Every structure is written in C-alpha cells, then in structure tokens.
Amino acid sequence: MDAMPIRFDQCLSAWETQINQNIDLIELMIPKLSKLAQGGTAIGTGINAHPKFSEEFCKEMSNLTGHQFKPSDNFFSQLGSQDTIVALSGHLKTTAVSMMKIANDLRWMNSGPLAGLGEIELEALQPGSSIMPGKVNPVIPEATAMVCAQVIGNDAAITIGGQSGNFELNVMLPMICENILSSLELLANTALILSDKAIKSFVVNEDQILKACLLYTSPSPR
C-alpha cells in the first residue's frame, strides 16, 4: 500500500525481532523438557520399577546426550497429560506464523515486474514458465509457506492429543511424538533454506522503489 516510506533495514529488523522472540520462547521450554517420566511405569506410581530407576535413567541419558535430564516432578501429571509438549508446539506454531509472514512479504516484494511491487528480485533457483519467459517464481517463500501450514496443522493434532489423556494415561503419545518431531525438523531445515536462498541473496530494485508515490508523503506539508 502506498502509505509511509520505510527503509529496508527497518523491514528486516522487524523480521529479526519476530524470530528472536520465538527463539527466546522456545528456549524457555528446555528446562521443562529435561524432566522425564521414565520410572513412573504405567500410571505414575512407579510400581514394579526399582526405586532408583528414574534417577539412574536420567543420569545415563545425560551422559549419552550431553544434556542434563532430571526425573519428573510429578509422574502422574506427566503420564496423563502432555502440557509441556503442547506448549512447545504452540511456540513452534507461532514461529511458523512468523515465518509465513516473512515469506509472504518476500513474495509481495518480488511480485511484478510490471503488475506487482517489484521492490526486490529473488534469486532464480529454477526455470520459470515455458510460456512466460523471464518469469521467476518465488519457490523458496512458497515452500516455506507450505511448511508453515503443515506445522500449524501439526499443532492442532498435538493439541487434540494433549487433551485426550484419561486420568493418568494418554494413549496418543505416538502421534504427539511424530508431529512434534516433524515440526521441529521442518522448521529447522526451512529456516536455514529461507535465510540462505531467499533473504541473503535478494537484490533491491532501487530504481523501482524511487518511483513509489509513498516517497512524497514525508515531505508533504501538514
């Protein structure tokens, strides 16, 4: 929209802030994710398990992975519900929403050159259309948008799985696990590709920007 002028570094700072905020929220989940329910056995009482099983299991996991794990504060809660994973998924969904917004901004900026904004040129990663010579499709932002839609869908499934616990048991753990791991992998890989193949390599069309009517808004008399 032809409104007020804004610099490209200001646009990029907004994207940076969105992503950094999401990273901070995800990192806050790490201490909660480090508490494991192993040793609670079927319903959290620890029946038929050695009294030190949970503690020893966490020590072994810490040694194997290099991350510090601890026994759950409450096995009954952690076996019957998956609130921590639901919360993590919510933060991943928010990250996906932010990334989709960035991808859509790139698509709009790249639109044109005649019937669109034409403010930037994305790197041509593959041939465009055989019937429209010179057309460059924003394939990375488009792929990013699809991934983000999938992560948002995964979050919906995880939410349903989390609320499906009955008393001290939740039989939807395999589905929850599949979707949270999928969301983590999809977002991690896509964030790198979006950064390397779209954001780092786009070229600003200065001539096109200088023709924008919005540049005349700032010096206009009040």
Residue ranges and their predicted role:
Residues 1-9, 38, 116, 120-123, ...:
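Glycine-rich cofactor-pocket loops
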Residues 4-158:
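Internal glycine-rich alpha/beta core junctions
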Residues 49-52, 204, 219:
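Short coil/turn linker and secondary-structure boundary residues
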Residues 150-212:
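Long, amphipathic alpha-helical stalk/connector segments used for oligomerization, subunit docking
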Residues 216-222:
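Conserved small/polar residues in nucleotide/adenosyl-binding loops
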